[in-house]
Every structure is written in C-alpha cells, then in structure tokens.
C-alpha cells in the first residue's frame, strides 16, 4: 500500500530524525504508513521521554489521514471541505504544486495601486500637453503665455536645441492660437524677448521665420508675419526720437536695430512661383535706420551702425546693386564725413575706418577660381621645380624626375612629411608660441563686448 503512495516533497523529512528512525527499526516504512496511525504512539512517547525537543510545526495544509502526526490527523477529520474527501495521492500533488505560488505571492511587493513611475530627469510640467482627438497637442486653459515664455527662455539658454524643439512648439501653437488676440500676444512675447536679451536676436529671427511659414492658423484679419512687421513698424516710427534719447532709450533702440537686421537676413518670403526672397520693406527700413544713427553721431549710435553694417552690409550692397542703386556709396560717404567732422572717440573712428577697409575688400568675401585643374607632370612643365632635392651616400643629387631613384625618393619624401611641422633646430615651426605676434590687442568692439561680459558676470555673482 505504501508503494503506491506518492509522498509530498518535504513531508516527513523533519520527523525522520526522531520518530521516523524508530519506525524503520520496527520494520515499518518511514514516512506515512497508510491509514494505520496507532502503531506510532509508543515510538512517539519513547522519543518524547528520552529527548525533550520543540515539537515540529505542522504543515499549513496537511494530507488527510496521515499517520505521522496525530494533531494533523485530528484537524483533518474535523474538516468538512470537499478536498478532504479526495484520494491521498491527488491531494498531495495539489499541495506540492501550490507551495511555489504561495511563496511567490508572499515575497512580492508589487502593487497595482502604486504611483506612476517617472525616470530621473523627466519633467511632468514640461510635458503638460495632452492629445485631443488624436491630432495636435493641447495646453490647459490659461497657460499659453507661460508656455511660450518658458520656451523662449529655454531657447535663450540652449539655442542649439532649436531644430529639435521648434516643430512640437509650432504644433502646440497651431492648436492653441486661434484668435487675433492670442496671435498678437505671441508676437509681442517674441519681440520683447528679442530686444531685451541681446543674444536672442538671431534665434528670435529664426523663430519668426519658422512660425511665419509653419503657423497654419486662419485669424480673421492678419497672419503672424504681418503682425510682426506691424509691431516693428511701430518701433521704427520712433527712430529719430530714440536716437536722440537718453542712454536707456538708445540701448533699447540699438537692440531693435540689430533685431531688424537679423530679421532681414532670416525672414524668408515665398513668392507665387515658389522662389524665396527677402522682405523689401526691411531693406528700406535698414537704410533709414542707418541715416538716423549717423544723424546723431554719438559713440554708441556709431558703434550700432558699425555692427549693423558688419551684419548686413554685404547682403544690402548686393541687393542695391541688382537695382542699380548707389545706396551703399552714400552710406560710406556719410561714414567718412563722420570720421572727419564728428567729435567721436578715437576708438570709434578706428572702427569706422576698419569698416571702410572691410567694404573695399568686398566685405571679406573671397571668390574661388571658376576652374581648377590639378597639376601633373604631363600638363605642368614646372611640376618638379618646387620638389626637394636629396643626395645619395656618394653625394649624387637626385629629384623626383630621376626614374632610377623614384622609389627611394618617395621614401625620403614620406619621411619629410612626417616631420613637416618641425624646423631644423627641433622646434615646432607651426607653434604660434615661437612666433612674434604683435597683433594681440583687442579692437574696440571686442573690448566693449568683454566689458559687458565682466559686468554681467559680476551682476550674476551678486544675485
């Protein structure tokens, strides 16, 4: 009967140390012995009398009718569940299969009600857009101004992220900016950021160009580019008064002038046939702004004019030449008169003279030759004239033209190329440390930028 009984894993192993050993000596099979449990009582009493030990904990779910444990047998007789009426081997298998599942359920600390997990560095506030109807992301009501301002501040700190983040930004605006008031507010935010933060003028102009071509909204009156030019027109009409104003007014006016120059270079207008042109109104506006700056020849006005011409001079002159206009000649003439007559500082006069030299050199542009043909021994008779001459161990000179020494010549030439940057005395000929460079002084524009940088650094330290 015991041969056909399947013992559950682990059951009876602990009892084999005491009672199971004596049953083996008595000729009985260790472990469960079928339905007879009375024969184990003498052995149990003898083991308890010879050695006092803590009774073993009964299993949570023991097999019914087991003769090894009287307490477990008594408990099993009291149960009335259907499992108690199953065969012994079936119930034992059920116990052995249920134990790993119970153990895993007790050790697990996972919960379906746990809070949502976010990786480190993930910002929930920066991703507060939600999808609506599977189309464009939408912002919660009343947060458009904060969203746009945060994005502008982010571009100011990280202008390199423009290409990656401007597309989702325009998607949000396409779904949120639906009225003339919200569009006007968007234009004003970008304009104020461009003239209040000097380093944002270029990025702001790029952003204006992108939005003017990709902001697909249909307001009742005007689009983004029209409202932007209208806002610039309002500031443009104050040019003479601003050029004569105090230092703060002139500083704001100069920021507007440079932003308008960036707009002229970056704002693209697509024609009816798909051609891309620049805004003509900005071209004429820059000419008027230069006249206002030269009409009030104080140092900061003249320096602003120099910066504007360095930025847009070559493009303006090319555009005026296409129309057969001599506007750049008039600008240069006014600049020379300022150098001769105005009571500006010596550094500013030096900046103006250098700008005249820059324009005389075609604004520093170098046009490559239209045709280029690589020199070879067949098409260039002077091909071997600039090649070095080597000598054999016998003192016989040879060059690349000698066919008997071509292999040896190439080997020596490669060795010379390996030490190309070193002179005969062992020093590095290409190292600027050994060169006498007297032109290490900063020009006035660089000095001004450096002073501004130092002042901004001190201001940030005090905050």
Curated annotation (Swiss-Prot):
Gene Ontology molecular function, alphabetical: RNA binding; translation activator activity
Cytoplasm keyword on record: yes
Record's compositionally biased regions (Acidic residues): 433-442
Residues of the MIF4G domain: 145-362
GO biological process, one term: regulation of translational initiation
Location within or outside the cell: Cytoplasm
Region (Disordered): 1-86, 420-442
Record keywords: Cytoplasm, Translation regulation
Pfam families (alphabetical): MIF4G
Taxonomic superkingdom: Eukaryota
Annotated Gene Ontology cellular component terms: cytoplasm
Signal peptide: none
Chief location bin: cytoplasm
Described purpose of this protein according to its UniProt entry: Acts as a coactivator in the regulation of translation initiation of poly(A)-containing mRNAs.
Quaternary state and interactors: Interacts with the RRM1-RRM2 and C-terminal regions of epabp.
Protein name: Polyadenylate-binding protein-interacting protein 1
Classification lineage: Eukaryota, Metazoa, Chordata, Craniata, Vertebrata
Gene name in the database record: paip1
